[in-house]
Each structure stands twice: as structure tokens, then as C-alpha cells.
A protein has these predicted regions:
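Conserved beta-alpha-beta core of the PfkB/ribokinase-like small-molecule kinase fold
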Residues: 34-104
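Short, small-residue-enriched loops and turns at beta-alpha junctions
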Residues: 12-15, 41-45, 72-74, 128-129, ...
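Conserved phosphate-binding/catalytic region of the ribokinase-like
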Residues: 56, 74, 102-204
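Short beta-strand segments
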Residues: 7-10, 37-38, 67, 123
Length: 204
């Protein structure tokens, strides 16, 4: 079958003490570290938890990355996150529009930059990916070719690959590594493995 069924379970109940422990751990982060805030917030936690985390880290040299949607994403922009990663559908959803072309996606990515995001990484399904870096330079990467087996975790893999690639300081290489990592997960039964990532990099 070519159909894919995704089951999303309800998150655990997280109490106030666990949240307090989280913030104590945040104080152990050092300059140059990266923290990724991804997905939805459990219903037992305050809805502004992401905002509080970014406010807590404000003024420190820590890369804050947010992979979320709707108000969870929009409300953190005032804290100038280092990177946000909506897909093209989520980007359009923020502004109540449907985006199709690279130029449309770039235009709305720039709006997010104007609202505070330093770097905007947009996954565009079969169109590949677009990165608007903090120098306002737009980078576009095509999509890898292969047989889709599993799309679950592809966005997370792309983000992980991008951040790993960014250790070299080159946005273009980081975008390619992220694209290959996302593709490697999509074309496998599980998560991306290095050999498959390296193979797909040759396509980009």
C-alpha cells in the first residue's frame, strides 16, 4: 500500500516541579550551545512555555531553534530565535495564505525575519528546501530522488542534518546536509543513517 497512517499519542502529564527542573537545566547551557524546541507543548504545561524558555536565555550566546507551528512559533519571534523551521504549508498558515512558488515562500520567510527570526529554513516537499539566512541571502536546494517509505521524522532529520552541517559555518553545505538527512529518513524504514546520507549528498 502507498498509504501512510500516522498515530500521535497524548503527551505525559508534566507537573510544576518538572518544569522548574527544566529551567534549572537551562542554566547549565554554555555560550555556543544549541537548544531545539520542537513540536507541541503538553496540555499540562503553560502554553507560553517556549516563550518563557527563550526569555530565560535572552542575552546569552546560545543558539535557540524553534520547530513549531501557529502561535507557538509566532509568539517566540520577539526573542529573535537563531533558527525557525516551518514547512511551506505551516508558513502559509501563519499568514492565512497558500504558498506555491519559491518567490512566494521567500517573500513570507522575509516577513518572519522582519518579525524577529534570524534564519528561516522552509521545507517545501517535492520542491526541496529554502533557507533565508541572517544576512538575508536566499539559498535553495533541490530534492533527493528515491522511493518514499516513511515520512515520519523527516523534518526532524532535516533539522538535525542542517544544524550538524552548520558546524562548518557554511549555510549552503548545511542546507545540503539537512536535505540529504531528511531524504535518508524518507527513503528508509527507520531513521537516516550516515551511509545513505552520504549517498544522497552526491545528488545535490
Amino acid at each position: 500500500s502507498e498509504e501512510e497512517t500516522e498515530l500521535n499519542g497524548q503527551g505525559p502529564a508534566i507537573g510544576a516541579e518538572a518544569v522548574a527542573e527544566l529551567f534549572r537545566k537551562l542554566d547549565k547551557l554554555r555560550d555556543g550551545d544549541t537548544i531545539v524546541l520542537a513540536g507541541s507543548i503538553p496540555s499540562t504545561m503553560p502554553s507560553d512555555t517556549y516563550e518563557k524558555i527563550l526569555a530565560h536565555l535572552k542575552g546569552k550566546q546560545i543558539r535557540t531553534v524553534v520547530d513549531a507551528t501557529k502561535d507557538l512559533l509566532k509568539n517566540v519571534l520577539q526573542y529573535q530565535p537563531f533558527l525557525i523551521k516551518p514547512n511551506h504549508y505551516e508558513l502559509g498558515e501563519l499568514f492565512g495564505v497558500t504558498l506555491h512558488s519559491h518567490s512566494e515562500i521567500e517573500a513570507y520567510a522575509r516577513k518572519l525575519q522582519e518579525m524577529g527570526a534570524r534564519n528561516v529554513l522552509v521545507s517545501m516537499a517535492e520542491q526541496g528546501a529554502l533557507l533565508l539566512d541572517e544576512a538575508s541571502i536566499c539559498h535553495i536546494c533541490g530534492v533527493c530522488q528515491g522511493t518514499v517509505k516513511n515520512s515520519v521524522g523527516a523534518g526532524d532529520s532535516m533539522l538535525a542534518g542542517f544544524l550538524a552541517g552548520l558546524e562548518t559555518g557554511d549555510y549552503t553545505d548545511a542546507l545540503k546536509l539537512g536535505t540529504a538527512a531528511g531524504g535518508a529518513t524518507t527513503f528508509s524504514e527507520g531513521l537516516a543513517e550516515r551511509a545513505e546520507i552520504d549517498r544522497l549528498l552526491l545528488q545535490l
